[in-house]
């Protein structure tokens, strides 16, 4: 544990929206009188019909979560229309292309027109309130237009990260029975094209075999690359928007109407469709964006995430735009044209607030300080971290080298399921400890529970649960409420279980220690081990597979695969087969799931009842096999000896 304490910077304290006294006062009110607190803050968004009920939640039995349930509003209206009078000519989105010489500024008035046109295109082609629309786009302004257009007409968007494979895209189309897809001819990433339309065509064919028929595909021309065309199905975005009106009335939405589905990995193979609704989600995204980043009107805010992840939903699109902010959207990667790109963008667009992932920071730290110090970064006021715990070394580098010791760091903990940040410092209120997410946001009640379900008080280690609801919380797993209850509420009764381990120190600060279930955190993105295992087993040479994480210097966790082969398959050249399996997993899931280590083994360590002992596999992958713990239930000890002998991570 880091013993260093960084007191609130005088500059941060001077202009802050929330000082420590206010934090303590508000927090106390938020947990002792949630109805009163959230009624007050629920009015930060505009309502067509004001709510009279605030909180109606129960973590027991059938688990119901409702906030502002009789209120009527529209997310797109709150992110655009309500700003037009006072800040119509203010820049809403700064788009920075993959190519450093290409950028675009979109004002709130232009955003209104673009979103209304896209909304009218959706309506023209039969998309109605409640229909699911799949968005498979690169980081271009049209991705934000598409999300806001869906919200405007009451369609439910499902954004799929443009790095996912056709198979992964198809699975997400099928699960929510989406019949309308928005994509691009190609994406551009690090100077290289990404075949999005081709992937979409393949995904649609796969979905059709599972009886889900996509009727229309709206294609944004990004590169002008050659694409195949489905007559009567495929539509060019630029032609369609030219043929419709630039005005579209926002659909009145009940606070509990669905806003979006976003798929996230679980500990079982099939990704879960996390469902977020309208009112509570927007209140929470908007409020956390304002107070965590201490956002002041006129500042330039940049979150480097992709809209394919929840961070992009809440902190590139919905939170900032609900607050009338200027949000920067970056198409590129941190190391193209070179490792100084982030800091060049900061200087070019005078960025004040910068929010990124520890994986990117560790990679940039390894490239050397000169890429940072050659830029001025004089406009930076606040730094943020998201996606995984940040190790103290990377934190110190971020603070000292990137921030020149003048920018507080908000190390934020939250998940797709949470809708917004749950544990975080507030820049003008919280003394910082490198590596700690520090204290809960308003209304959030963290609890540490041991494996037997006993609540731990004071200084403790345990499983991180939240004992009461907050407005941004997911409502269900799309189409599978039973799975929602089983995943999050069955392990510890009456509490939401995050799946993360956590430590609380003597100051009441929280330190996230990583996943405690079979989910990996690769470069800040979640992947279920079961998902990777089923991809491996679908290869004709593989009989069985077990996947675990191990510490990785850049990605946080690496992917270590133990594979047993079909009879006869071991005659192949092992290096060639390894390459083949890596390609196979990339094809099934996407590059994000690329295995780092593959170890071929005659067998896996199992109990006499046939259960794989993953604890042992983790220890071997970490090269820590001296402490394997109790192995008395092992069916065959010889299997473990072979695994140790042939481990891929020998130090």
Swiss-Prot record:
Q: Which cofactor does it need?
A: Mg(2+)
Q: What is its EC number?
A: 6.2.1.1
One molecular function GO term is:
acetate-CoA ligase activity
Record-listed N6-acetyllysine modification sites? 611
Q: Which domain of life is it from?
A: Bacteria
UniProt binding sites for Mg(2+): 537, 539, 542
Query: Which GO terms fall under biological process for this protein?
Result: acetyl-CoA biosynthetic process from acetate
Disulfide pairings: none
Q: What this chain does, per the record?
A: Catalyzes the conversion of acetate into acetyl-CoA (AcCoA), an essential intermediate at the junction of anabolic and catabolic pathways. AcsA undergoes a two-step reaction. In the first half reaction, AcsA combines acetate with ATP to form acetyl-adenylate (AcAMP) intermediate. In the second half reaction, it can then transfer the acetyl group from AcAMP to the sulfhydryl group of CoA, forming the product AcCoA.
Family to which this protein belongs: Belongs to the ATP-dependent AMP-binding enzyme family.
- Name assigned to this protein: Acetyl-coenzyme A synthetase
Q: Which species is this record about?
A: Brucella melitensis biotype 1 (strain ATCC 23456 / CCUG 17765 / NCTC 10094 / 16M)
């Amino acid at each position: 544990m880091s013993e260093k304490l960084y007191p609130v910077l005088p500059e941060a304290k001077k202009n802050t929206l929330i000082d420590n006294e206010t934090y303590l006062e508000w927090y106390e009110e938020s947990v002792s009188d949630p109805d009163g607190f959230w009624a007050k803050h629920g009015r930060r968004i505009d309502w067509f019909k004001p709510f009279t009920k605030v909180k109606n939640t129960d973590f027991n039995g059938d688990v119901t979560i409702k906030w502002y349930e009789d209120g009527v509003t529209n997310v797109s209206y709150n992110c655009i229309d309500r700003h037009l009078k006072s800040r119509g000519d203010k820049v809403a989105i700064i788009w920075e292309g993959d190519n450093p010489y290409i950028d675009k500024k979109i004002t709130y008035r232009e955003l209104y027109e673009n979103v209304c046109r896209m909304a009218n295109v959706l309506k023209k082609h039969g998309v109605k309130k409640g229909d699911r629309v799949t968005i498979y786009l690169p980081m271009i302004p049209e991705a934000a237009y598409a999300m806001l257009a869906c919200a405007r007409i009451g369609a439910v968007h499902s954004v799929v990260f443009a790095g996912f494979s056709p198979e992964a895209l198809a699975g997400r189309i099928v699960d929510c029975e989406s019949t309308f897809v928005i994509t691009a001819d190609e994406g551009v990433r690090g100077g290289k094209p990404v075949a999005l339309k081709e992937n979409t065509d393949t995904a649609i064919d796969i979905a059709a075999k599972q009886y889900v028929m996509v009727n229309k595909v709206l294609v944004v021309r990004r590169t002008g690359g050659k694409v195949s065309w489905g007559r009567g199905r495929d539509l060019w975005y630029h032609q369609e928007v030219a043929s419709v009106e630039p005005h579209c009335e926002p659909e009145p939405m009940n606070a509990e109407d669905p806003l979006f589905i976003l798929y996230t990995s679980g500990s079982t193979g099939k990704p879960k469709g996390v469902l977020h609704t309208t009112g509570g989600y927007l209140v929470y995204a908007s409020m956390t964006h304002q107070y965590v980043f201490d956002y002041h009107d006129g500042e330039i805010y940049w979150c480097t995430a992709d809209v394919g992840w929840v961070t992009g939903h809440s902190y590139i699109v919905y939170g900032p735009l609900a607050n009338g902010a200027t949000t920067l959207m970056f198409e590129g990667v941190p190391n193209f044209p070179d490792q100084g790109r982030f800091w060049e963008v900061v200087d070019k667009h005078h960025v004040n607030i910068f929010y990124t992932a520890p994986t990117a920071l560790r990679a940039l730290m390894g490239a050397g300080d000169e890429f940072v110090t050659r830029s001025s970064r004089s406009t930076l006021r606040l730094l943020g971290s998201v996606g995984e715990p940040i190790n103290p070394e990377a934190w110190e580098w971020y603070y000292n080298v990137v921030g020149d010791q003048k920018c507080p760091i908000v190390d934020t903990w939250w998940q797709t399921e949470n809708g917004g940040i749950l544990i975080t410092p507030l820049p003008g209120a919280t003394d910082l400890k490198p590596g700690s997410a520090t204290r809960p946001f308003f209304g959030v009640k963290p609890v540490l529970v041991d494996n037997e379900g006993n609540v731990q008080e004071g200084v403790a280690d345990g499983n991180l649960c939240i004992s009461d609801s907050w407005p941004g919380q997911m409502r269900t797993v799309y189409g599978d409420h039973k799975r929602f209850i089983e995943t999050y509420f069955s392990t510890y009764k009456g509490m939401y279980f995050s799946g993360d381990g956590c430590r609380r120190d003597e100051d009441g600060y929280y330190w996230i220690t990583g996943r405690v279930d079979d989910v990996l955190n690769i470069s800040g993105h979640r992947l279920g081990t079961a998902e990777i295992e089923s991809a491996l087993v679908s290869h004709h040479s593989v009989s069985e597979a077990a996947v675990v994480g191990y510490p990785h210097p850049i990605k946080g966790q690496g992917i270590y695969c133990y594979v047993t082969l079909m009879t006869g398959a071991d005659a192949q050249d092992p290096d060639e087969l390894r390459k083949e399996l890596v390609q196979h997993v990339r094809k099934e899931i996407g590059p994000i799931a690329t295995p780092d280590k593959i170890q071929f083994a005659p067998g896996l360590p199992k109990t006499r009842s046939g259960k794989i002992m993953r604890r042992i596999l983790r220890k071997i992958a970490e090269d820590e096999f001296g402490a394997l713990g109790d192995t008395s239930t092992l069916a065959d000890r010889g299997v473990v000896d072979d695994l140790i002998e042939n481990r891929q991570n020998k130090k």
